[in-house]
Regions:
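Non-catalytic accessory segments flanking enzymatic or RNA/DNA-binding domains
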Residues: 1-276
C-alpha cells in the first residue's frame, strides 16, 4: 500500500457538488479527496500521538474532540453550554472568553429540521449551513427560524424537542437512507403546537430576535455510498491503531468499510497516516 497522507486529522471537509456530498480528509494543512477512494482498500493508522488543537500540547487523551485537559477546562468552546446552549451564561458576565462568545454565540443562529435517522430539530450558526447538515448525514433539511443568539436558539430547540428528537441515531444513519418526509408540514405542525411557547420567547426577547424563515424549500442531499453494512461494527483506534477495509461509502463524518465504520470527527487531533 502507498501512503497518501499523514498528519493531525480533523473532521472531513464536506461540500455539495449538485446534490452529492464531496469529502476530503484534512491532515494538518493538507486535504486528500476521499470520494475517489470509494471501492479501494484503505488503511487508517493511528501513529500514537495526540496534539491539542488549541495549544499543540501532547496529550494522552483527547477531551471535547481534540483538546488537552487544561484547555478543555478553560476554553469557552469546551464549556457545558456548547452542548446545552440554553445554559449560556454570557449575559451573567461569566463567559470563559467573552471575545469568543461575541463571535460565536452572540450572533445569528438558525433553527432547522433535518432528516438523518429520522426527523430532528437542531441549531447552528447561520454561516454553518449547509455544512452542519452534511456533517450530520441529513438527507433532507429545512431552516425554519432565524434567532438572534445561540442561547435563544437553545430555548427554541428545548421547546421543540418535546415534539421531535434532537439527536441522531448513528446506527440507523449507517444502515440506510431515512424515508423521505414532508418537512414543511412537520414545521407547520410544530409552529402550531408550540405557538404559545414561541410567543412567550418573542415577548421575552423581542419579535426581531426570533423570526420565521419563509419561502425556503427543503434541501435534498445525497451521500456517496455504494453499499450500507448489514451489521454495524465500529473501529476503535485507541484499542487497535489500524482501521482497514474496502471503503464502501461516506455519510456524515463516518467512513463505511466492508469491515466496520469509523467516525473521523471523534479522532480530531490524532496523528494518522492514510494508505491506499
Amino acid at each position: 500500500m502507498i501512503e497518501i497522507g499523514r498528519g493531525a486529522i480533523s473532521k472531513m471537509s464536506a461540500r455539495l457538488d449538485g446534490p452529492t456530498v464531496q469529502y476530503a480528509f484534512r491532515l494538518g494543512d493538507v486535504e486528500v479527496p476521499v470520494n475517489p477512494l470509494i471501492g479501494s482498500t484503505i488503511r487508517l493508522e493511528y501513529l500514537g500521538a495526540i496534539h491539542c488543537t488549541h495549544c499543540g500540547r501532547r496529550t494522552k487523551t483527547s477531551f471535547s474532540q481534540g483538546y488537552c485537559y487544561p484547555c478543555m477546562t478553560k476554553l469557552a468552546q469546551c464549556d457545558l453550554c456548547i452542548m446545552s446552549p440554553e445554559r449560556c451564561h454570557f449575559d451573567a458576565g461569566t463567559c470563559r472568553d467573552p471575545a469568543w462568545g461575541e463571535q460565536f454565540c452572540m450572533t445569528d443562529h438558525v433553527v432547522y429540521l433535518a432528516n438523518s435517522s429520522g426527523v430532528k430539530v437542531g441549531i447552528t450558526r447561520a454561516t454553518q449551513l449547509p455544512t452542519r447538515w452534511l456533517d450530520q448525514g441529513a438527507s433532507q433539511a429545512l431552516p425554519i427560524l432565524r434567532v438572534a443568539t445561540r442561547q435563544q436558539s437553545g430555548f427554541v430547540e428545548d421547546l421543540f424537542r418535546s415534539q421531535v428528537a434532537d439527536k441522531t441515531n448513528w446506527r440507523a444513519l449507517l444502515k440506510g437512507d431515512a424515508a423521505a418526509v414532508d418537512l414543511p408540514a412537520i414545521r407547520d405542525s410544530l409552529f402550531e403546537s408550540c405557538a404559545q411557547g414561541l410567543q412567550g420567547l418573542q415577548e421575552r426577547f423581542g419579535l426581531q430576535a426570533i423570526q420565521t424563515i419563509a419561502d425556503v424549500e427543503p434541501i435534498e442531499i445525497r451521500y456517496p455510498v455504494q453499499q450500507y453494512p448489514a451489521k454495524i461494527v465500529s473501529f476503535n483506534l485507541d484499542k487497535d491503531p489500524i482501521a482497514e477495509g474496502t471503503l464502501l461509502g461516506i455519510k456524515g463524518q463516518y467512513l463505511i468499510f466492508d469491515t466496520g465504520v469509523i467516525n473521523i470527527r471523534k479522532y480530531t487531533a490524532y496523528q494518522l497516516a492514510v494508505h491506499q
